[in-house]
């Protein structure tokens, strides 16, 4: 083999090595690019996932905030409605109290009412002797109906007429007015108690009004609610 042949073979080997190196370099470049694209895609997907999660989290926060605000507004509205109902009920009670106060101003009808209240109190207590308290202004009216009240009670229960002691030392408060605007008041009626004070029947007009009002209060509130709803 001469020098020309040797040189030719060497050149062929060099070309082969160079070609193989280029192919290998291309393979490495393609592989690296694929890995880069995969990593880039993974990073993009990871960021998208983070963004979606953050969006969902904020969306839930907004929804929760809306529910809280709605609940607060609803509660505030309910409180306003209840307050308005309470104001109406208070006004009704005040108006009824004024009407009750007018009852004692008609002496003829009030005198009969006092007798009925005394008889009713005696029937509740069923005591042979009782202590009666009334307003100072009503003292003469009470005294005028005592005997007829005792007789009516005795006839109803077929017993002896009871002893009724009218308290001349302690009277029920006077009716509401400017002189006792901030103190206790009584619109009329009587308080009857057993002699030992253990049993008490409060049969004042104010107490009767309070009992009636409490019984009617659910119905009153129901009507107020239906009016608001309408």
Curated annotation (Swiss-Prot):
Organism annotation: Citrus limon (Lemon)
Alphabetized GO MF terms: proton-transporting ATPase activity, rotational mechanism
Family listed: Belongs to the V-ATPase E subunit family.
Taxonomic superkingdom: Eukaryota
Description of how the protein assembles with itself and partners: V-ATPase is a heteromultimeric enzyme composed of a peripheral catalytic V1 complex (components A to H) attached to an integral membrane V0 proton pore complex (components: a, c, c', c'' and d).
Keywords, comma-separated and alphabetical: Hydrogen ion transport, Ion transport, Transport
One Pfam family hit: vATP-synt_E
Membrane as UniProt keyword: no
Function description: Subunit of the peripheral V1 complex of vacuolar ATPase essential for assembly or catalytic function. V-ATPase is responsible for acidifying a variety of intracellular compartments in eukaryotic cells.
InterPro entries, alphabetized: ATPase_E_C, ATPase_V1_Esu
The UniProt record lists the keyword Nucleotide-binding: no
GO cellular component, one term: proton-transporting two-sector ATPase complex, catalytic domain
Annotated protein name in UniProt: V-type proton ATPase subunit E
């Amino acid at each position: 083999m001469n020098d020309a042949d040797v040189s030719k073979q060497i050149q062929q080997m060099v070309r082969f090595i160079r070609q193989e190196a280029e192919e290998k370099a291309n393979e490495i470049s393609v592989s690296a690019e694929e890995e880069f694209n995969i990593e880039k895609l993974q990073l993009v997907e990871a960021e998208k996932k983070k963004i979606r999660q953050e969006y969902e989290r904020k969306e839930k926060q907004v929804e929760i905030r809306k529910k809280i605000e709605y609940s607060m507004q609803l509660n505030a509205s309910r409180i306003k409605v209840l307050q308005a109902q309470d104001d109406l009920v208070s006004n009704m009670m005040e108006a009824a109290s004024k009407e009750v106060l007018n009852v004692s101003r008609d002496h003829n009808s009030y005198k009969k009412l006092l007798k009925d209240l005394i008889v009713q109190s005696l029937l509740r207590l069923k005591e042979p002797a009782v202590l009666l308290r009334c307003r100072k202004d009503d003292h003469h009216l009470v005294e005028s109906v005592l005997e007829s009240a005792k007789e009516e009670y005795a006839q109803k229960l077929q017993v002896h007429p009871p002893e009724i002691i009218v308290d001349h030392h302690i009277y029920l408060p006077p009716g509401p007015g400017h002189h006792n605007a901030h103190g206790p008041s009584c619109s009329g009626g009587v308080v009857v108690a057993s002699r030992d004070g253990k049993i008490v029947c409060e049969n004042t007009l104010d107490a009767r009004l309070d009992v009636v009002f409490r019984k009617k209060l659910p119905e009153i509130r129901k009507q107020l609610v239906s009016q608001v709803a309408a």
